[in-house]
Each structure stands twice: as structure tokens, then as C-alpha cells.
């Protein structure tokens, strides 16, 4: 991943846009259903992002993606501190999304159902061996799955559902506390 120069507002410098093949036009972005992704949580693997870690607990590293004509831009926001890296599409070996099943209670029938594909882990592997990892919240999973199934990633994208036992959803405890007298 290459560190990318951005303005304070997060706009890419023209030289960086040119390096990654340029931005898509308005109509191209409309046809693609957008070029940006929803935010996910950065875990590890990118030196420029790891260097921003102040050691302050509970600070979340949110990352969003933007497709360029010949690259993928990753923008990190950590408590109003911004960083940006990019990688050319040709340098990406694979993009792997693993889904994890969650057991959630069905309020209507008062039983538990297994919901599939609710939480995920995303890994981007480059040909040079570098791997970066991200965690996907349940509310962003479907949109990220749709984002990486675009034709720009068709030969790089791998999707699987974990064979691990379904995880338990503890949201029912919050619901119970809300109904507590």
C-alpha cells in the first residue's frame, strides 16, 4: 500500500488521482451505483495506519474504500485524524470476505433462528505478501458484500461463510433490560 497525499478535507491531490488512473465521471459513478463504501473497522496490516495508533483505548479506526479507474483508495478516520493509502488493482492478489453466522432470537415465535452472514472479516492480500484486515459490523455487511462484487473486483474477490459454530447475539439482553419493570 502506498501512502496517499490528501488535503485536510480528504480530497486527493491531482497527482495521486493520476497515479491511480483518475476518478470516474459523474455518470460512470451513477452506472456503478457509487464508488465509495460504507465504513468498516480497520484491524491491522497497513503501516501508515498503524503509525497513527496513539495507544488510547476505545478509539476506533474507521476505514472507507473508494474505487479509482486503476486503484483502490482506503481512507482512515481515527477521532478526526485522517490518513489515506492506495493500492493499484493490479497489485491486489485477492480480497477475501468471510461471513460469520449469528444466532438471534425470533421475537414472534420466541425461538432462536440462525441468521447467516451478519458479521464479517475482510482481508486484502497484495502480491508482495502484505495482508490488511478489517472487521465488518452486522449493519454494514450486506453493503460491503455488494461493494466488492462489482466487476472491478470480479477476478480478485472471494466470499465464504465460516464453518465455525454460530455466535450468540447478546442483543436480547438489552431488549430484556428495556422491558424490565
Question: What label would you give each PLM region?
Answer:
Residues 56-108:
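Phosphoinositide-binding peripheral membrane targeting modules
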Residues 1-43, 56, 93-181:
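Acidic, Ser/Thr- and proline-rich intrinsically disordered linker/docking segments
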Residues 43-49:
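Short Pro/Gly-enriched beta-strand edge/turn motifs at strand-loop
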Amino acid at each position: 500500500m502506498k501512502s496517499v497525499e490528501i488535503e485536510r478535507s480528504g480530497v486527493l491531490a491531482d497527482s495521486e488521482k493520476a497515479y491511480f488512473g483518475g476518478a470516474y465521471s459523474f455518470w460512470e459513478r451513477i452506472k456503478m451505483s457509487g464508488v465509495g463504501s460504507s465504513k468498516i473497522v480497520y484491524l491491522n496490516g497497513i503501516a501508515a495506519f498503524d503509525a497513527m495508533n496513539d495507544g488510547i483505548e476505545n478509539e476506533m479506526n474507521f476505514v472507507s474504500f473508494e474505487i479509482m479507474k486503476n486503484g483502490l483508495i482506503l481512507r482512515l478516520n481515527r477521532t478526526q485524524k485522517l490518513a489515506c493509502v492506495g493500492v493499484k488493482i493490479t497489485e491486489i492478489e485477492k480480497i477475501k470476505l468471510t461471513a460469520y453466522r449469528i444466532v438471534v432470537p425470533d421475537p414472534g415465535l420466541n425461538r432462536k433462528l440462525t441468521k447467516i452472514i451478519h458479521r464479517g472479516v475482510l482481508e486484502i492480500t497484495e502480491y508482495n505478501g502484505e495482508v490488511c484486515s478489517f472487521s465488518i459490523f452486522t449493519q454494514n455487511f450486506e453493503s460491503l458484500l455488494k461493494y466488492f462484487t462489482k466487476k472491478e473486483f470480479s477476478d480478485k474477490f472471494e466470499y465464504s461463510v465460516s464453518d465455525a459454530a454460530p455466535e450468540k447475539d447478546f442483543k436480547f439482553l438489552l431488549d430484556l433490560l428495556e422491558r424490565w419493570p
